[in-house]
Amino acid sequence: MNIHFIVVGQKMPGWVQTGYAEYAKRLPKACTLKLVELPMATRGKSGSVAQYKAEEAKRILSAVPKGAKLIVLDEKGQELTTVQFSQKLDDWLGSGQDVALIVGGPDGLDSSLIQQAEWKWGLSKLTLPHPLVRVMVAEQIYRAWSVLQNHPYHRE
């Protein structure tokens, strides 16, 4: 299974690339994490937030592989424990489908995209910076994988 981690925004600091790469490389071929960076909509004086989000939603949907489960990160999404998330990962692995895990731009995701999602994942009630989210998601996927494999990385 491939997890296509589709994010709006580019040019992350070096520490983000290093942290993300560290956790992504720890995952086995049976559960690969592939980063897909998309440019933000160009902000201008005449545009609106709704227009920017709609433009980004089109880019996101064009990057989602055919047949992939659509999962969005959303501040109002379901928050899970590590063990609960590992069960979610196990379900994804068992389905045989790829997963498209979506992070929107600075203005969030278009509501039409959120409505299309099979699941809405909330990392925290806190507002988190996009660079940190990239590393956290990669780490949580690796942690969930380690729980499924009874690897000592995660401790209860």
From Swiss-Prot:
It is an enzyme of class 2 (transferase). GO terms for cellular component: cytoplasm. Belongs to the RNA methyltransferase RlmH family. One of its GO terms (molecular function) is rRNA (pseudouridine-N3-)-methyltransferase activity. InterPro entries: Alpha/beta_knot_MTases, RlmH-like, tRNA_m1G_MTases_N. Homodimer. S-adenosyl-L-methionine binds at L73, G104, L123, S124, K125, L126, T127, L128. NCBIfam families: PRK00103.1-4, tRNA_RlmH_YbeA. Its main location: cytoplasm. The keyword Phosphoprotein does not apply. It catalyses: pseudouridine(1915) in 23S rRNA + S-adenosyl-L-methionine = N(3)-methylpseudouridine(1915) in 23S rRNA + S-adenosyl-L-homocysteine + H(+). Pfam families: SPOUT_MTase. Its EC number is 2.1.1.177. Keywords: Cytoplasm, Methyltransferase, rRNA processing, S-adenosyl-L-methionine, Transferase. This is Ribosomal RNA large subunit methyltransferase H. It is found in: Cytoplasm. Specifically methylates the pseudouridine at position 1915 (m3Psi1915) in 23S rRNA.
